[in-house]
């Protein structure tokens, strides 16, 4: 779970570094090489994992009748949409709006990715102590980071620190909600529920990128954080006042 989240966050700064120094064709070539190595590792090295409980299509209603899972799916879609409304265009935002140099843009994106490790650390140390409070703080943090992106963009060090805070919050969200999927899905359906979660997250990536692109085209790139933040506020309110209530009901019944 953490590995997937780190890969998603570190991909942009690493790709930018390769692209700036070796050309963007080489960046895509490196992606292909890494994919080939990963595939070879899975085929020839990775141990075979015994199959778990079988799951049939007739059991799908169990997932869709699960209020907690449905709430998590919806919050995830809104989160991914809000996140990628801003993150998809963060590089030109840092250049054109924040006025950072190329080196500082690369440094900021690297810090963004590295801060994700802190988000994973916070999850491992504090989630089990009070998971409901942890989830609330994560949702509020993501919304706050997006909403503050434009207002503090002219203060260079402040925007760098905000991006670090944002990266930490995003990682904390990813590991938290993937963990929740495993917790609240039926045992036989956990892999299917996780696959649905991944599909919904990717749908959010697409919708967020489209919304951010539309804002850049018809308004200004300055407003991508505000737009993403407004969506994140909706996600936070839904999570805090609806989904957490379902989580508590499920936990009491378990």
Where on the chain are the PLM-derived regions?
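Helix-loop-helix hairpin linking two adjacent transmembrane segments in secondary transporters
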Residues: 1-46, 89, 93
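Structural signature of transmembrane alpha-helices in multi-pass secondary transporters
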Residues: 3-12, 38, 112, 197-205, ...
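Helix-to-loop junctions at the C-terminal end of transmembrane segments
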Residues: 119-131, 216
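C-terminal transmembrane helical hairpin of 12-TM major facilitator-type secondary transporters
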Residues: 132-177
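A late C-terminal transmembrane helix in Major Facilitator Superfamily
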Residues: 183-221, 228
């Amino acid at each position: 779970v953490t590995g997937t989240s780190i890969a998603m966050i570190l991909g942009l700064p690493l790709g930018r570094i390769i692209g700036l120094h070796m050309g963007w064709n080489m960046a895509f070539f490196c992606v292909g090489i890494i994919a080939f190595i990963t595939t070879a590792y899975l085929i020839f090295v990775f141990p075979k994992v015994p199959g778990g409980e079988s799951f049939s299509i007739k059991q799908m209603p169990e997932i869709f009748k699960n209020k907690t899972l449905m709430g998590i799916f919806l919050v995830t879609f809104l989160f991914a949409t809000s996140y990628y409304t801003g993150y998809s265009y963060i590089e030109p935002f840092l250049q054109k709006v924040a006025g950072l140099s190329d080196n500082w843009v690369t440094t900021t994106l690297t810090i963004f990715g590295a801060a994700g490790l802190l988000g994973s650390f916070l999850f491992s140390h504090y989630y089990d102590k009070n998971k409901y409070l942890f989830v609330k703080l994560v949702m509020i943090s993501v919304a706050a980071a997006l909403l503050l992106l434009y207002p503090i963009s002219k203060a260079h060090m402040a925007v760098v620190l905000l991006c670090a805070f944002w990266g930490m919050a995003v990682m904390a969200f990813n590991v938290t909600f993937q963990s929740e999927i495993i917790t609240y899905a039926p045992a036989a359906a956990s892999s299917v529920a996780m696959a649905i979660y991944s599909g919904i997250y990717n749908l959010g990536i697409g919708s967020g990128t489209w919304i951010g692109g539309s804002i850049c085209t018809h308004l200004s790139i300055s407003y991508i954080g505000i737009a993403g933040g407004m969506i994140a506020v909706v996600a936070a309110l839904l999570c805090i006042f609806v989904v957490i209530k379902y989580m508590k009901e499920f936990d009491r019944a378990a």
